[in-house]
Amino acid sequence: ALDHFYEDGKTFEEVYDHIVSYVLDQCRSQDVVYVVPGSPVVAENTVTMLVERGQAAGVAVTVLPGMSFLEVLYTRLHLDPVNGVLILDSSDVASLPVDTTVPVVITQVYDKRVASDVKLSLMDLYGDEYEALLVHHISLPDEIVRPVKLYELDRIDTIDHLTSLVLPEP
């Protein structure tokens, strides 16, 4: 497990850089299997970085498919992405346009500071009382899917890196 990189890193960029460097270093002396939860191409920056830096270093990287949390979320909430769903990382909510005419999934609402930033950006578009869905640990035994008003978002104690917010279609 590479959890210690997350505990020691100051930013996600730093954490990802250290993980990729470590994995590529291990590849010099042995075959390595690097496994991520869910799909390796959904919200997994380290995989993209491994492919790019692996190619540059002459290391063969094979990426195999896996099911992401999004497939579970679509099923639980009866969302058909073919009809339109906007998926944003929490760090992009303030800087990217949000289409309020389709359901919006905001991933990686990983702490109260991020939740507060997301809340403030969304309240400008939807209003304080808008009811979103908090999706926490989906498909795990302690899964929570519950309504939450936007103004309450940063008051929730169960927020971590496996927390998302869904803004249903208006």
Language-model features, listed with the residues they occupy:
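Class I S-adenosyl-L-methionine
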Residues: 1-60, 163-164
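Alpha-helical scaffold segments in soluble metabolic enzymes
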Residues: 22-25, 49, 72, 76, ...
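Class I SAM-dependent methyltransferase SAM-binding "motif I" and its flanking Rossmann-like core
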Residues: 34-107
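A polyampholytic, Gly/Pro-enriched intrinsically disordered region
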Residues: 15-22, 79-94, 150-162
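A contiguous loop/helix-start segment that scaffolds small-molecule binding in enzyme catalytic cores
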Residues: 28-32, 98-170
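A short acidic, often aromatic-flanked loop/helix-cap motif at beta-alpha or helix-coil junctions
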Residues: 2-10, 69, 93-94, 113, ...
